[in-house]
Amino acid sequence: NVIKKHKPELDMERVYLNAHTHGIEPHRHIDDGDYTIIYYPRLDWKTEWGGGTFVNDKFVEYKGNRLIIFTASMPHQAQAVSRQCYELRTCVVFKTNVKKD
Protein backbone atom coordinates (compact mmCIF):
# COMPACT_ATOMS: atom_id res chain seq x y z
CA ASN A 1 0.00 0.00 0.00
CA VAL A 2 1.45 3.33 -1.09
CA ILE A 3 0.43 5.15 2.09
CA LYS A 4 2.04 2.60 4.40
CA LYS A 5 5.25 2.85 2.34
CA HIS A 6 5.56 6.65 2.48
CA LYS A 7 3.69 7.55 5.69
CA PRO A 8 3.22 4.44 7.88
CA GLU A 9 1.82 6.54 10.74
CA LEU A 10 -1.31 7.40 8.72
CA ASP A 11 -4.73 5.75 8.48
CA MET A 12 -6.65 6.18 5.24
CA GLU A 13 -10.10 7.70 5.81
CA ARG A 14 -11.29 8.23 2.21
CA VAL A 15 -10.04 7.75 -1.32
CA TYR A 16 -11.59 9.07 -4.52
CA LEU A 17 -10.85 9.96 -8.13
CA ASN A 18 -10.88 13.66 -8.94
CA ALA A 19 -11.28 14.67 -12.59
CA HIS A 20 -11.87 17.76 -14.70
CA THR A 21 -11.47 19.12 -18.21
CA HIS A 22 -10.78 22.50 -19.76
CA GLY A 23 -13.37 25.07 -18.66
CA ILE A 24 -13.57 23.86 -15.07
CA GLU A 25 -12.01 26.44 -12.73
CA PRO A 26 -10.89 24.71 -9.52
CA HIS A 27 -11.05 26.72 -6.30
CA ARG A 28 -8.52 27.16 -3.51
CA HIS A 29 -9.46 25.20 -0.39
CA ILE A 30 -8.22 23.24 2.62
CA ASP A 31 -9.14 19.68 3.55
CA ASP A 32 -10.26 18.13 6.79
CA GLY A 33 -8.09 15.45 8.34
CA ASP A 34 -4.34 15.47 8.94
CA TYR A 35 -2.73 14.80 5.55
CA THR A 36 -3.82 14.87 1.92
CA ILE A 37 -2.07 12.64 -0.60
CA ILE A 38 -2.52 13.19 -4.33
CA TYR A 39 -1.44 10.67 -6.98
CA TYR A 40 -1.21 11.69 -10.65
CA PRO A 41 -1.85 8.51 -12.70
CA ARG A 42 -1.74 9.84 -16.30
CA LEU A 43 1.58 8.77 -17.84
CA ASP A 44 0.57 10.43 -21.14
CA TRP A 45 -0.02 13.88 -19.58
CA LYS A 46 1.76 16.75 -21.38
CA THR A 47 3.29 19.67 -19.45
CA GLU A 48 1.65 22.23 -21.75
CA TRP A 49 -1.78 20.95 -20.69
CA GLY A 50 -1.38 22.42 -17.19
CA GLY A 51 -3.36 20.59 -14.52
CA GLY A 52 -0.77 20.70 -11.76
CA THR A 53 -1.53 21.69 -8.19
CA PHE A 54 -0.71 24.79 -6.16
CA VAL A 55 0.02 23.81 -2.55
CA ASN A 56 0.52 26.73 -0.18
CA ASP A 57 1.29 28.90 -3.25
CA LYS A 58 4.03 26.53 -4.49
CA PHE A 59 3.40 24.92 -7.87
CA VAL A 60 3.64 21.14 -8.30
CA GLU A 61 3.61 20.08 -11.96
CA TYR A 62 1.36 17.20 -13.02
CA LYS A 63 3.69 14.32 -13.91
CA GLY A 64 2.44 10.78 -14.37
CA ASN A 65 3.16 8.44 -11.45
CA ARG A 66 3.91 11.37 -9.11
CA LEU A 67 2.73 11.30 -5.49
CA ILE A 68 2.51 14.45 -3.37
CA ILE A 69 1.86 14.54 0.38
CA PHE A 70 1.01 17.66 2.36
CA THR A 71 -0.69 18.77 5.56
CA ALA A 72 -4.44 18.90 4.89
CA SER A 73 -4.72 22.39 6.38
CA MET A 74 -2.46 23.85 3.65
CA PRO A 75 -4.46 25.84 1.09
CA HIS A 76 -4.31 24.11 -2.28
CA GLN A 77 -5.89 24.30 -5.71
CA ALA A 78 -5.71 22.37 -8.97
CA GLN A 79 -4.39 24.34 -11.93
CA ALA A 80 -6.83 24.80 -14.80
CA VAL A 81 -6.43 22.54 -17.84
CA SER A 82 -5.34 24.15 -21.12
CA ARG A 83 -7.73 24.66 -24.04
CA GLN A 84 -5.34 22.51 -26.13
CA CYS A 85 -6.08 19.51 -23.91
CA TYR A 86 -8.97 17.26 -24.88
CA GLU A 87 -8.17 14.74 -22.17
CA LEU A 88 -9.53 14.31 -18.65
CA ARG A 89 -7.21 15.54 -15.88
CA THR A 90 -7.40 12.84 -13.22
CA CYS A 91 -5.82 12.36 -9.83
CA VAL A 92 -6.44 9.96 -6.99
CA VAL A 93 -6.89 11.72 -3.64
CA PHE A 94 -6.31 10.05 -0.28
CA LYS A 95 -7.60 11.76 2.88
CA THR A 96 -5.70 10.49 5.92
CA ASN A 97 -5.36 10.96 9.66
CA VAL A 98 -2.49 10.22 12.02
CA LYS A 99 -3.07 6.89 13.80
CA LYS A 100 -4.28 7.19 17.36
CA ASP A 101 -2.67 4.92 19.97
What are these regions (language model features)?
Residues 1-67, 73-101:
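Fe(II)/2-oxoglutarate oxygenase catalytic core
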